UniProtKB/Swiss-Prot annotation:
Record GO biological process: isoprenoid biosynthetic process; polyprenol biosynthetic process; ubiquinone biosynthetic process
Any single GO CC term annotated in Swiss-Prot or TrEMBL for this entry: cytosol
Protein name per UniProt: Octaprenyl diphosphate synthase
Enzyme type, top EC level: transferase
Cofactor field: Mg(2+)
Family (UniProt): Belongs to the FPP/GGPP synthase family.
Gene Ontology molecular function terms on file: all-trans-octaprenyl-diphosphate synthase activity; identical protein binding; metal ion binding; prenyltransferase activity; protein homodimerization activity
Organism classification: Bacteria, Pseudomonadati, Pseudomonadota, Gammaproteobacteria, Enterobacterales
Function in brief: Supplies octaprenyl diphosphate, the precursor for the side chain of the isoprenoid quinones ubiquinone and menaquinone.
Keywords: Isoprene biosynthesis, Magnesium, Metal-binding, Transferase
Recorded superkingdom: Bacteria
E.C. numbers: 2.5.1.90
Binding site for isopentenyl diphosphate: K45, R48, H77, R94
Amino acid sequence: MNLEKINELTAQDMAGVNAAILEQLNSDVQLINQLGYYIVSGGGKRIRPMIAVLAARAVGYEGNAHVTIAALIEFIHTATLLHDDVVDESDMRRGKATANAAFGNAASVLVGDFIYTRAFQMMTSLGSLKVLEVMSEAVNVIAEGEVLQLMNVNDPDITEENYMRVIYSKTARLFEAAAQCSGILAGCTPEEEKGLQDYGRYLGTAFQLIDDLLDYNADGEQLGKNVGDDLNEGKPTLPLLHAMHHGTPEQAQMIRTAIEQGNGRHLLEPVLEAMNACGSLEWTRQRAEEEADKAIAALQVLPDTPWREALIGLAHIAVQRDR
């Protein structure tokens, strides 16, 4: 199923999600309204709330509470973006100035805190202790992942295992929670819950692998941020590690130095040459496709419905995208 058909299938539910997001962002504090609206209207993909919507429908849910789960998932994602951009000193996201560039670091951090706490208010409104447990654990793991990534900055010696732990924690865990919590809310079977959980984990991993790849081979304007940001920030992502381990000794030393020192955007062209020579970008894409295939396989426990087909379609879209 292509994105157009997925959007048609989820149009009513996603309209409810967007309305819930705007309603729950409302505050008596004007700056929260201004910055909150600035970030949520920034043209994000909404893939995480869409997973939540589709997962609930795929196991036969007919109520409306999945809209709340979808909205709070987007809130958690939004709060992490606000904090990430401060940590990374980013100035562009989704083709426009980041919130910290537009409003300042302090406002971004504090509004991020507000959005986190509002997400937990929404969780408690669902009346499901298990959903609260899963989401609380997910947010904790996400925070750990961000700290792990911070520890890995400027470290060219991190292992692939360490890298995969980081992307599971900071990205895939929220995908996993989105699918799992919707299944829990819908009263799905344990087998279906496990299938949804695995789907989210594998899809989130594939999604982040493609994100890391696009940092090196996308068009900056289309990507909506600066190409080579990871290199400039000294982040050792999988494409960079592959090129360092499979390139010439000279290329390996250049990449090692770029990671250690940061501020390496001027080395982007020779780094890309090394990646192309080693097939690093294609290798990373293949790894992402393997994860997407695992995500699709995990859905076999679900009934064969258009909702399941849409989840399968999302897995394909995640690895075929160019932004």
